[in-house]
Amino acid sequence: MAEVEIILIRHGEAASSWGDDPDPGLSNLGKSQAEAVKENLESFTSQNFQLISSPKKRAIETAQPTSLDWRSEIKIDDAFSEIPASNIKLERRMEWLKSIMNMDIAMLPEDVKEWRSRIIEKLINIKSNSIIFSHFMVINVVVGYIKNHPILLSMYPDNGSLTKIKVSNGKISLIKIGDEKNTKINT
C-alpha cells in the first residue's frame, strides 16, 4: 500500500466562541490566518493534494483561499467536524468541553468515542495526499491516537497551524506537530 501524506490544519480564529455560536465564520484575524495558510501551502500546489474540510463555516472559510488559488474543489467531510455536542446547551459547552478533554478515553460518552473512531478510520482509509481543514479537538484526537495518549487533550494547536502525518499500511504516524499556543479553547 502506498504512503499517504496528510496535513491537518486548524481553522483560523472564529468570529465568536463555540459556546456563543454553534457555527461561526472567521473573524478578521481568522481571514488573515486563512491567507497565511494558503501561503504556507504553496510548496504543495504541484503535489496533487486533495482539499478536505469539516462542514463548519470556519473550516470552509479557512480552506477557501487555498481552494481559489489552486483552482481545486473543497470536499466536505463531516468525519472531520468538531466534537459532537448538539445535545449540550450553548451556555454549557465550554464547561462540558473542559471536562471531556481531560476524561479517560475509555470513559468518554459513546457519541464522542464513535466520533473519535470515525476520524481515525477515515484517515487510515484516505487513498491520496490530503489537506484537511478542521478543528482543535480533531487534531487532538489524531495526535493523541498516534502518541497513545490516555485522554483527548494532547496539544494546543494554534489557529492556522499545520500538523503533518502519514498513513502507511494502515498505520498513522506523526511527521510534524504544528505550532501550538496556550489559548482559550474556541474549537
Regions found by a protein language model. Give the residues of each.
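Acidic, low-complexity terminal tails and accessory targeting/binding regions
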Residues: 2-4, 72-76, 81-95, 125, ...
